[in-house]
């Protein structure tokens, strides 16, 4: 059986990792072993945080809606309950945008929800 020399394959694999590690500080971008560890950790963090980002934005929207709702004398939970009861289907992202950019429109939605 012929001997398999892995020079090209190994170099390609290492260069691929070093390319991913570009921009990391000191040996983390130059030494293969530490670069490999840093890249693995970075990819793990990226995977986790893509899921966490969705939670974080939802929390931000809820905080903004709650703050704006309390200016109009109603809590977040009461507002959401009233919106569901009034069958107003607007998501939290749009509601938060209204609260920040168009306070008059947000007030109109709050009043409409509380009437029902």
From Swiss-Prot:
Pfam families according to UniProt: Ribosomal_L20
Range of residues in the leader sequence: none
InterPro entries, per database record: Ribosomal_bL20, RIBOSOMAL_L20_CS, Ribosomal_protein_bL20_C
Entry GO terms, CC: ribonucleoprotein complex; ribosome
Gene Ontology MF annotations: rRNA binding; structural constituent of ribosome
Family annotation (NCBIfam families): rplT_bact
Membership in a protein family: Belongs to the bacterial ribosomal protein bL20 family.
Name of the molecule in the record: Large ribosomal subunit protein bL20
Lineage: Bacteria, Bacillati, Cyanobacteriota, Cyanophyceae, Synechococcales
Gene name, Swiss-Prot/TrEMBL: rplT
């Amino acid at each position: 059986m012929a001997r398999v020399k892995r020079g090209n394959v190994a170099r390609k694999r290492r260069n691929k990792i070093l390319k991913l590690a570009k921009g990391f500080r000191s040996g983390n971008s130059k030494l293969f072993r530490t670069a490999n560890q840093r890249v693995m950790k970075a990819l793990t963090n990226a995977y986790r945080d893509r899921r966490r980002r969705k939670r974080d934005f939802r929390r931000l929207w809820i905080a903004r809606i709650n703050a704006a709702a309390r200016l109009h004398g109603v809590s977040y939970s009461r507002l959401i309950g009233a919106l569901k009861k009034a069958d107003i289907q607007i998501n939290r992202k749009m509601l938060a945008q209204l609260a920040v950019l168009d306070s008059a429109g947000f007030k109109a939605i709050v009043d409409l929800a509380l009437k029902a």
